[in-house]
């Protein structure tokens, strides 16, 4: 609420995000889902001590994301939670918390703070810890990517999401491909779908 009030007061869009939800396992998927005013959280944080992958009893950040979005979209009828990536750099001259481990790529008309924030609010961005995409589009219920492939590197794209209805598995894999131009056509029973490129 305070972020929204500040944005209105300044007449500028402001994007706030929840940092490293698994640092000390601070948040559950239910808590992430229920704060519907929060639209962004760190699905990837490059700091080595934030429990990105979870442990044997707690979900990793991507699983938290799927669980939270299943609740938001399926039960609360709320907007989805978007995932951002950051490097969380603490040092700039060596060490294991240096810059360049995670970032976002925003599809905006030009490099302008307001346009970047507005594009993020519309979900027109992707998060990365290494892969670059030439294109991302979602039209006519078709999600299409074009991976900027590097010579000698192979890529795998998994389409992950949650279906509508009781008993649906949060974070189900809907498909996988090794193509540089992966495509997913919605069947109509998905709450959401996201692409994971490795």
Each predicted region: which residue ranges?
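C-terminal functional module detector
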Residues: 71-82, 87-198
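Short, solvent-exposed loop/turn segments at the edges of secondary structure
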Residues: 35-38, 99-101
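A metal-dependent hydrolase metal-coordination microenvironment
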Residues: 1-36, 44-51, 56-64, 71, ...
């Amino acid at each position: 609420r305070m972020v929204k009030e500040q944005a209105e007061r300044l007449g500028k869009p402001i994007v706030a995000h929840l940092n490293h939800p698994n640092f000390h396992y601070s948040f559950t998927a239910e808590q992430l889902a229920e704060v519907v005013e929060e639209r962004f959280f760190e699905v990837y944080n490059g700091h080595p001590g934030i429990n990105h992958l979870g442990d044997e009893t707690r979900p990793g950040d991507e699983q938290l994301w799927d669980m939270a979005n299943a609740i938001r979209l399926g039960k609360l009828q709320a907007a989805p939670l978007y995932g951002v990536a950051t490097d969380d750099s603490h040092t700039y001259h060596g060490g294991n918390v240096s810059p360049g481990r995670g970032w976002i790529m925003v599809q905006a008309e030009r490099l302008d703070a307001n346009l970047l924030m507005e594009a993020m609010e519309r979900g027109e961005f992707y998060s990365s810890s290494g892969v670059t995409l030439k294109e991302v589009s979602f039209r006519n219920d078709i999600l299409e990517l074009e991976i900027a492939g590097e010579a000698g590197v192979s890529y795998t794209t998994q389409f992950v999401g949650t279906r509508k209805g009781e008993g649906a598995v949060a974070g189900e894999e809907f498909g996988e491909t090794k193509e540089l131009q992966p495509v997913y056509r919605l069947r109509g029973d998905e709450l959401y779908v996201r692409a994971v490129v490795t």
